[in-house]
Amino acid sequence: MFKTLYARIAIYSITVILFSALISFVLTNVYYHYNLKASNDAKIMKTLKEARQYEQSAKPTHIQQYFKHLGQMNYQIMTIDQKGHKTFYGEPFREDTLSQNAINNVLNNQDYHGIKDKPFALFVTGFFDNVTDNTVGINFKTKDGSIAVFMRPDIGETFSEFRTFLAVLLMLLLFISISLVIASTYSIIRPVKKLKLATERLIDGDFETPIKQTRKDEIGTLQYHFNKMRESLGQVDQMRQHFVQNVSHEIKTPLTHIHHLLSELQQTSDKTLRQQYINDIYTITTQLSGLTTELLLLSELDNHQHLLFDDKIQVNQLIKDIIRHEQFAADEKSLIILADLESINFLGNQRLLHQALSNLLINAIKYTDVGGAIDIALQHSHNNIIFTISNDGSPISPQAEARLFERFYKVSKHDNSNGLGLAITKSIIELHHGTIQFTQSNEYVTTFTITLPNNSL
């Protein structure tokens, strides 16, 4: 029954309606018991005493006819003579519950207030309890002696039409309330069901079909965020497919080249050519090894929760070590590396920061013309650490500049790199809560600027 949200909301709402009706009935009964019962008793007692006064002044010939006439006026009456004989007038009582002690007291001229003294019952309204002890009683003097007269209004007869009206009203109230609860519950559940179907489509890989935002409440907000999530997942899926295609291409091309070189190696007996083929195969396998290393590093950066950033790094010394390591490559192109480094300490991951800065210097050496210069600077600026590396090189188009930090992107098709270096650098800098920017001047000087928070204070 409670397996669906629709049934749960509907049953909860109906239960609330019925429980509210029950509580309302109990509270009404309590209100009658403590506020209305005494005044109701007094009104009926007043009516009965007026009837006795009329009987004593008018002296009707047949007292029974007089009580019968009162019974026809929607009163229930019970008379008891000295011998204990009981006579009923009007509609019959549901049950005779009057005690003999109460009867004797009335015969001895004591008034009886059974309505006022009726004990409280939680689920029984005293006003409607049609029993003989729920009456008022007084002594009547007749020519045949004293009689005890007990009377209460005939609620059933007096309010018969009202009871019918009330019953119809309550039935309609419950029917309409329950119908509206079911309808309103359906209006709430319908967009949730559509959201469920959209989620199932999402699981099946459909990232293109949006759901219509039909409301402005919390469900509408949920629909809006679902569409945003769908778009994000679609982008992630496209990136995944693009990544797989790029990796496949980066691996397939060198493997095809190796296969071709091995075929040539088998068919030639020329020692010079054989050595050249072996050297080419070695170069390609080295590139594949580098690609594998960088892919593993990218995976590590994407799942960085286990990484620690608490190494105390002397950044200026780190840069000097990188320059010394890459000096041979710079000397091969007769490049001059100028470094202006302030003494700066930084708290981070030394291995990753070394990789990021090395990538930038390797790129600068690679794309600087022979005999050119590379300028490196490290300095404080307010609460930040600023690292810049500039070099002379060929200009980069605005289209290429916009995609410079994308994974597997290459500025030139003839570039023998795998296009991951700058993407790795950007990820590392962002994990250190920093930023990296690329600019170029009219003189074809390209500059990478890294800004890191000065966290060594």
Swiss-Prot record:
**In which organism is this protein found?**
Staphylococcus aureus (strain NCTC 8325 / PS 47)
Q: Name one GO biological process term.
A: osmosensory signaling via phosphorelay pathway
Record domain HAMP: where: 186-238
What InterPro entries does UniProt report for this protein, alphabetically? Answer: Bact_Sensor_His_Kinase, HAMP_dom, HATPase_C_sf, His_kinase_dom, HisK_dim/P_dom, HisK_dim/P_sf, Sig_transdc_His_kin-like_C
- Annotated membrane-spanning segments are 9-29, 164-184
Could you identify this protein by its name? Heme sensor protein HssS
Role this protein plays: Member of the two-component regulatory system HssS/HssR involved in intracellular heme homeostasis and tempering of staphylococcal virulence. HssS functions as a heme sensor histidine kinase which is autophosphorylated at a histidine residue and transfers its phosphate group to an aspartate residue of HssR. HssR/HssS activates the expression of hrtAB, an efflux pump, in response to extracellular heme, hemin, hemoglobin or blood.
Alphabetized, the UniProt keywords read: ATP-binding, Cell membrane, Kinase, Membrane, Nucleotide-binding, Phosphoprotein, Transferase, Transmembrane, Transmembrane helix, Two-component regulatory system, Virulence
Please list the coiled coil stretches. none
Question: How does the record say this protein sits in the membrane?
Answer: Multi-pass membrane protein
Q: Identify the SMART domains for this entry.
A: HAMP, HATPase_c, HisKA
